[in-house]
């Protein structure tokens, strides 16, 4: 069966699902395979629960007499191809967002700004991979006026795969930094992979939103029509802005090309988030959002999922940024934490994963950053930091369980604490003891 024929059947359905636990009438089931499961084994159950069709790639489980079963060579590839056809069919303008750091926050801010004026489809959570992107695209409906699609990557070619599904008309790379080096091989590999978004835009008459102050992006975006934002005093920017204070929440000001200044008090922690806010405002203004609406949307945005959140426990003030960590974001978090006015500061930092051969070097650099800012109450969690700490005198813990044991025997009170590390370290498990 061709992709077009599958899509025609899909149009009689109410939606799609890849989760056998969420099957029901009206939903087309795509039987994806994972490391620990094979969706083909759940096809019969999905049909019994009312799914009108199930797309599968296991010939042994396929019943040619059952017209509800659709056999293909590869279910994931078919899901992506059907999503791409759906995107082409509707023709909704798509804004693609990627980057090493800040892409999810920027996506959420952009959605907040654009939603003041338009009916917007936006990636939910961090569904930004080879499965999440096509599922998001499949959610497009005729009433959507714009789509904001977040795209993540950990290996070369990942963004190329995702732009072929989402087919963005406009693109934003928040930044490029040292993350997933195990998969990318090098920082140059990061740049090439993230730059696959620019490559798509070049080949399809697209437009890029670019930070004028980011030298790497300025080199990467050559040959593209640009809409730019950045620090004040530069010619040709649609939006210019600057940090006013971080104590601990960011306040900044911005204006449109020489116009009146807007001052925005955010619920965001980290001066680096000003670039994310400026990007969202720039995108909004490009599509006709009113300036005050853009400011209000950014001011009212509340961060979620342990991304630069301030948590008051009654005993301590926690700056929780434990969703992910890489050398670029860790250095930025330390710089920002050094700017926060607090009497008694403490760090609980976890290993940065997926750095490959440069892992020890990058962890040593972070240890030097900690020393540079003069932090003394420092707890480091994981084997990479243990190997990099040297004679720093910082407290070392093999895992989060050891941290919790220490917190229970030595209660911590009255401190402002930065909690940051790769999500897999599990640092959020310490919060109940803080």
What is the role of each PLM region?
Residues 27, 46, 82, 97, ...:
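Residue-level signal for inorganic ion chemistry
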Residues 97, 305-307, 424-429:
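ATP-dependent carboxylate/acyl-activation modules
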Residues 32-37, 303-306, 322-393:
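Active-site beta-alpha connecting loops in nucleotide-dependent enzymes
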Residues 164, 403-411:
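Short amphipathic alpha-helix with an adjacent loop that forms part of the alpha/beta core around
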Residues 20-31, 120-121, 131, 135-147, ...:
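Mobile, glycine- and charge-enriched loop segments
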Residues 1-81, 85, 338-342, 368-369, ...:
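N-terminal leader/targeting and accessory segments in enzymes
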Residues 4, 60-65, 172-317, 342-343, ...:
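Acidic, Mg2+-coordinating active-site environments of NTP-dependent enzymes
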Residues 4, 77-212, 216-225, 432-434:
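Phosphate-binding loop of NTP-binding sites
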């Amino acid at each position: 069966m061709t992709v077009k024929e599958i899509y025609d059947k899909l149009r009689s359905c109410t939606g799609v699902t890849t989760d056998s636990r969420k099957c029901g009438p009206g939903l087309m089931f795509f039987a994806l395979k994972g490391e620990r499961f094979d969706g083909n084994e759940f096809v019969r159950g999905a049909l019994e629960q009312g799914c009108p069709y199930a797309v599968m790639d296991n010939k042994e489980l396929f019943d040619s007499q059952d017209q509800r079963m659709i056999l293909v060579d590869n279910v994931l590839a078919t899901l992506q191809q059907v999503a791409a056809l759906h995107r082409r069919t509707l023709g909704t303008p798509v804004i693609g967002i990627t980057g090493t750091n800040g892409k999810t926050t920027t996506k959420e801010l952009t959605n907040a700004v654009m939603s003041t004026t338009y009916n917007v489809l936006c990636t939910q959570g961090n569904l930004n991979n080879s499965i999440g992107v096509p599922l998001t695209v499949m959610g497009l409906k005729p009433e959507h006026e714009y789509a904001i699609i977040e795209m993540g990557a950990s290996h070369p070619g990942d963004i190329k795969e995702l732009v072929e599904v989402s087919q963005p008309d406009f693109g934003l790379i928040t930044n490029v930094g040292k993350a997933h080096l195990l998969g990318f091989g090098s920082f140059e590999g990061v740049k090439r992979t993230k730059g696959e978004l620019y490559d798509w835009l070049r080949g399809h008459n697209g437009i890029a939103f670019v930070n004028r102050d980011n030298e790497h992006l300025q080199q990467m975006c050559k040959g593209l029509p640009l809409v730019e934002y950045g620090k004040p005093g530069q010619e040709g920017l649609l939006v210019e802005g600057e940090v006013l204070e971080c104590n601990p929440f960011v306040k900044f000001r911005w204006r449109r090309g020489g116009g009146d200044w807007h001052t925005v008090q955010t619920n965001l922690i980290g001066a680096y988030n000003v670039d994310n806010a400026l990007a969202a405002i720039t995108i909004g203004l490009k599509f006709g959002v009113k300036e005050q609406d853009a400011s209000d949307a950014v001011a009212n945005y509340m961060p979620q999922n342990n991304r630069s959140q301030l948590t008051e426990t009654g005993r301590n003030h926690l700056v929780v940024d434990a969703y992910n960590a890489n050398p670029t974001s860790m250095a930025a978090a330390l710089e920002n934490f050094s700017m926060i006015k607090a009497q008694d500061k403490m760090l609980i930092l976890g290993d940065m994963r997926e750095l490959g051969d440069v892992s020890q070097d990058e962890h040593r650099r972070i240890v030097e950053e900690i020393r540079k800012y003069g932090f003394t109450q420092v707890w480091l969690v994981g084997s990479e930091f243990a190997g990099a700490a040297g004679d720093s005198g910082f407290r070392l813990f093999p895992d989060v369980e050891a941290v919790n044991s220490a917190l229970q025997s030595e209660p911590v009170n009255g401190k402002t604490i930065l909690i940051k590390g790769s999500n897999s370290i599990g640092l959020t498990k310490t919060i109940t003891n803080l």
